Amino acid sequence: MSIPGFVQADFDVFTIDGLEPRMEKIKNQIRPKLEAFGTELAPTLSSLTGDEMFVHTAKHARRTVNPPNDTWAAFANSKRGYKKLPHFQVGLWESHLFVWFAIIYESPVKGAFAEELLKAPTAIRENIPDSFKWSVDHTKPDTVSESELSDDAFTKMVERLRDVKKAELLCGITLDRKDPLVQDGDKLLHTIEDTFKTLVPLYQLAQQSTVQM
């Protein structure tokens, strides 16, 4: 059975004014698609990582005034939550779709993971394609390409993850909203799966950091 991709109207949801009107569209229009991808991707990630992975679709429950500027499905090895754990994300901003491996500010393994990255940065980055992106804040759409990231900038980014309480680190791909791939659900699914395969070593390194704590 084919899986539906994302159309321009899905990205336009993030231009709707007001919390309730935007949330209604997210719930009824975007979330079912993310859940469909989640159903397909969770078993794949479980196989790739060796951990049973569970899907967590963003509920944006803490929001009372400002509408969300993005939404996502996250994958982690816990039914209870994902924010404190190394995890994967698939989601949308108004401008693009993203596929991430993520360590966000709530994770207690940030420091240990950063130390592991600093031990062998060249070996780690050799497995990251030049087209992949890095982000230091999951709440902002800004990214930097692997091809544009100097050794010094990478080191500073990782040291910041270790030293700054609110620091984060995400790695993966972004696809422009007008990229034909975004609308083709089946091809998009394969692209996400391939991206996750590339990112699994980062996940395993983070899990190794968890064990060492």
Swiss-Prot record:
Domain of life of the organism encoding this protein? Bacteria
The entry assigns this protein to a family as follows: Belongs to the UPF0637 family.
- HAMAP family on file: UPF0637
Q: What is this protein called?
A: UPF0637 protein BH2637
Q: Which organism is it from?
A: Halalkalibacterium halodurans (strain ATCC BAA-125 / DSM 18197 / FERM 7344 / JCM 9153 / C-125) (Bacillus halodurans)
